[in-house]
Amino acid sequence: MATGKIIQIIGAVVDVEFNQDSVPKIYNALEVKNKQYKLILEVQQQLGSGVVRTIAMGSSNGLKRGLIVTDLGHYIKVPVGEATLGRIINVLGETIDNKGALKNNQSDKIEYWEIHRSPPSYRDQASCREILETGIKVIDLICPFSKGGKVGLFGGAGVGKTVNMMELIRNIAVEHSGYSVFTGVGERTREGNDFYHEMNDSQVLDKVSLVYGQMNEPPGNRLRVAFTGLTIAEKFRDEGKDVLLFIDNIYRYTLAGTEVSALLGRMPSAVGYQPTLAEEMGLLQERITSTKNGSITSVQAVYVPADDLTDPSPATTFAHLDSTVTLSRQIASLGIYPAIDPLNSTSRQLDPYIVGDEHYETALGVQSILQRYQELKDIIAILGMDELAEKDKLLVSRARKIQRFLSQPFFVAEVFTGFPGKYVSLKDNIRAFKGIIKGEFDDLPEQAFYMVGSIEEVIEKAKKL
């Protein structure tokens, strides 16, 4: 293995000099190791005369010029397979949950894969029209997820992206008994801790691999941690399993790329983002795909800066998604959770050829009633309800019931709301909304529709009011 020495350190950027005949390749992992220190660097640029510019995967505190650096001769490698289930690892595949080294039940040997891999060839890729039931009413009705598809949860700060993601993991792990990989990219350490304990309490931890690179980590770490999680998911997929990949938050991945780009001296583009924004997003998203062996269904939380969906980061992410779930601050302010906007959320799966005519017509009926209610709100605010035609009064009444019925108590939020969590099957979901549209429940008070699961619970609640 070739060795070099550190000649310059500027924060997370470290320049290393090698002999000209043994210069490491781009993205190779380099190791700095002495009695006090062990740090992995990733090669980003070859500057000429044997010098490479690298990004540190950990803190560069304590580094000094002249330290010996070893070229490991490969990209960063991480453990994959069932040994990672129920454990928390970092970007380098090291355990950070104080439970000791990874153990493999089936054999002593744990497999390691490089995090930089090519996407599957066109010949190996496969598409699937099967719907993935989540048990969340508004998602299953308005923006259904496809097995092997990509879903984005878009929302500003504090509208419920992480809570929605935790509920999806809980529902899919409990109801569908599949494997999940959760990748925390630049998010709060507290949330990562809460998430671990929530999964443990729900008894689904043994089906989830957790990969964390939190917001206190250097930018190189946050830029690569999504690839670590994806590599673990790819291993499960190639073993013939249907795996769920959760990334929270894809915006922090973009932000880490912006920081690295600035550190490397690249000229920024629109709104200060890196000039390679579309390419970096594509590198990650193109690998999240299904093959003939198994599928990867990905759910990605996307922070929307200043609630502006035209910002380059969320706008670039949009192009890669099959379903977009948009969380609205306006709906959250009404106390309706999950605060998903049914008029701004879309799915390619909402097609009569895929979901069937009944589901498609019910979803469109719900959206048209809510859209008409939205248009009438200005008239109601100025003139009041009494000035509306009888037909519109009835429509407003149904719209308010639909709006409240789209709320749902979550299992992961039981401690905050005091309501026990509910899972609603797609069949019951369609039947209930179809009934509301047809006016079967016009005689029930609208408060009976708030924070319940099925329509039977609405009828029970109405009797007590």
Curated annotation (Swiss-Prot):
InterPro entries to which the protein is assigned, alphabetical: AAA+_ATPase, ATP-synt_VA_C, ATP_synth_F1_bsu, ATPase_a/bsu_AS, ATPase_alpha/beta_chains, ATPase_F1/V1/A1_a/bsu_N, ATPase_F1/V1/A1_a/bsu_N_sf, ATPase_F1/V1/A1_a/bsu_nucl-bd
Cell location: Cell membrane
GO annotations of cellular component type: plasma membrane; proton-transporting ATP synthase complex
A GO MF term: ATP hydrolysis activity
Keywords annotated in UniProt: ATP synthesis, ATP-binding, Cell membrane, CF(1), Hydrogen ion transport, Ion transport, Membrane, Nucleotide-binding, Translocase, Transport
PANTHER family with a match to the protein in the record: ATP SYNTHASE, ATP SYNTHASE SUBUNIT BETA, MITOCHONDRIAL
Organism of this sequence: Buchnera aphidicola subsp. Acyrthosiphon pisum (strain APS)
Encoding gene (name): atpD
Topology within the bilayer: Peripheral membrane protein
Protein purpose: Produces ATP from ADP in the presence of a proton gradient across the membrane. The catalytic sites are hosted primarily by the beta subunits.
Reaction it catalyzes: ATP + H2O + 4 H(+)(in) = ADP + phosphate + 5 H(+)(out)
Top enzyme category: translocase
Keyword Metal-binding: no
Name of the protein in its database record: ATP synthase subunit beta
Binding positions (ATP): 155-162
Similarity comment text for this entry: Belongs to the ATPase alpha/beta chains family.
SUPFAM superfamilies from the UniProt entry: C-terminal domain of alpha and beta subunits of F1 ATP synthase, N-terminal domain of alpha and beta subunits of F1 ATP synthase, P-loop containing nucleoside triphosphate hydrolases
Main location, first listed in the record: membrane
EC number of the protein: 7.1.2.2
Superkingdom of the organism of origin: Bacteria
Gene3D superfamilies (alphabetical): 2.40.10.170, Bovine Mitochondrial F1-atpase, Atp Synthase Beta Chain, Chain D, domain 3, P-loop containing nucleotide triphosphate hydrolases
Record text on subunit structure and interactions: F-type ATPases have 2 components, CF(1) - the catalytic core - and CF(0) - the membrane proton channel. CF(1) has five subunits: alpha(3), beta(3), gamma(1), delta(1), epsilon(1). CF(0) has three main subunits: a(1), b(2) and c(9-12). The alpha and beta chains form an alternating ring which encloses part of the gamma chain. CF(1) is attached to CF(0) by a central stalk formed by the gamma and epsilon chains, while a peripheral stalk is formed by the delta and b chains.
